[in-house]
């Protein structure tokens, strides 16, 4: 069987909402990381890339009409290289990587650029067409995150809880109190701060030049979302999503901007272009859960993947669990039998600290996991995340050494 390798990857810094990257279009963000991936690997014949697969959750604005194809062209890849955009909401970037790996394993591709992009700052407002002549009942929807243009049958059957409301549901059903959530959030911030100070993200980040003022520019070089905090500060934050709730802005992921590009290659391509793989892509799995508790999606997805691979979770050296909310992260860890402060889970912080640019996050998890696996000299790394409307997705990496 053909083996699929994650050879390399690069990402932008993650910007805050309306922050450092807000002035950059999503197609330009994605083009930027593709361009850097090409520059870092001059031995590759980029005209022989079989596909560009990028995840993107919104696609209602400047990321419309197949942002993967746009980014491939803008990023300097030859016109004959095709591109396709994948949408599994928050899991889009990880799904793009899994799809690229499957193409290689199936013998349908030797080189694939995978990844994801999201500019939540630039997500547009949308308005449906009127359903009758001279109608004055038009509604406008913010596409930054969550539901819009809801199907009444969907609402009646499964509800349309907002993402924070689903986290409140998980907290209530799995007994995750406010203290546990705030403690988890603080660890994320502390680990991210240490990782930044130690330069652990330097290899995966490419700086972005952004406009500033009328004619000026500045260089964005580090993730913008981490912030200094304390349990006292976190405990003082309001719970705006539910009366008597536990979910706050401090124990939730951010609304962010960013892009990631990864290079996936077959064994033959690795040899042909003298590449050194980061990891082997061992497999991936997705699973569905009730939409109202979408945050527990990583549990069945991970169990499904582990069962398929015939390995136990105790054989995994690094786990990157997307921290959409502390409530669901803690619930997932408990359900999987892991300590809430497990040292090998998000050792460099997670989305609560670093941010969550939806369609890019899964690819970011995989890249960070692969680099941490290499740093530790471990054998396996797992990337897993919950997905809006009730899904989870997990992907396993194995050492290429």
Language-model regions, residue ranges each:
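Active-site nucleophile and cofactor-binding loops and adjacent substrate-binding regions
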Residues: 64, 83-92, 251-255, 281, ...
């Amino acid at each position: 069987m053909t083996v699929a390798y994650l050879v390399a990857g690069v990402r932008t810094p993650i910007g805050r909402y309306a922050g450092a990257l807000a002035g950059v279009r999503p197609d330009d963000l994605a083009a930027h990381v593709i361009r850097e991936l090409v520059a870092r690997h001059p031995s590759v014949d980029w005209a022989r890339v079989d596909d560009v697969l990028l995840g993107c959750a919104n696609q209602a604005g400047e990321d419309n009409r197949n942002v993967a194809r746009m980014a491939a062209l803008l990023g300097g890849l030859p016109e004959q290289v095709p591109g396709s955009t994948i949408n599994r909401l928050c899991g889009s970037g990880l799904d793009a990587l899994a799809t690229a790996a499957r193409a290689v394993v199936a013998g349908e591709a030797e080189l694939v650029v995978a990844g994801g992009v999201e500019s939540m700052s630039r997500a547009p407002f949308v308005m449906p067409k009127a359903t009758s002549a001279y109608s004055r009942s038009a509604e406008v929807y913010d596409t930054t995150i969550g539901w819009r243009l809801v199907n009444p049958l969907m609402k009646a059957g499964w509800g349309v809880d907002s993402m924070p409301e689903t986290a409140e549901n998980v907290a209530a059903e799995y007994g995750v109190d406010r203290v546990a959530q705030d403690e988890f959030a603080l660890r994320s911030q502390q680990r991210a701060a240490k990782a930044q100070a130690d330069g652990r993200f330097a290899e995966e980040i490419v700086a972005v030049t952004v406009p500033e003022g009328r004619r000026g520019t500045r260089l964005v070089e580090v993730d913008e979302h981490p912030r200094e905090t304390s349990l006292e500060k976190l405990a003082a934050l309001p719970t705006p999503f539910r009366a008597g709730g536990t979910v706050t802005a401090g124990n939730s992921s951010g609304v962010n901007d960013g892009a990631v590009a990864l290079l996936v290659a077959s064994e033959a391509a690795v040899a042909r272009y003298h590449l050194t793989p980061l990891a082997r892509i061992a497999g991936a799995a997705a699973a569905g859960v009730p939409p109202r508790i979408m945050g527990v999606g990583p549990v069945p997805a991970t169990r499904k993947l582990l069962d398929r691979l015939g390995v136990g979770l105790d054989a995994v050296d690094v786990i990157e669990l997307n921290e959409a909310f502390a409530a669901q992260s803690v619930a997932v860890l408990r359900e999987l039998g892991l300590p809430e402060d497990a040292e090998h889970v998000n050792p460099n912080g997670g989305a609560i600290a670093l941010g969550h640019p939806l369609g890019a996050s899964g690819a970011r998890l995989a890249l960070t996991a692969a680099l941490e696996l290499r740093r530790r000299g471990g054998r396996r790394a797992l990337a897993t995340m919950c997905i809006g409307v009730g899904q989870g997705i997990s992907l396993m990496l194995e050492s290429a050494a």
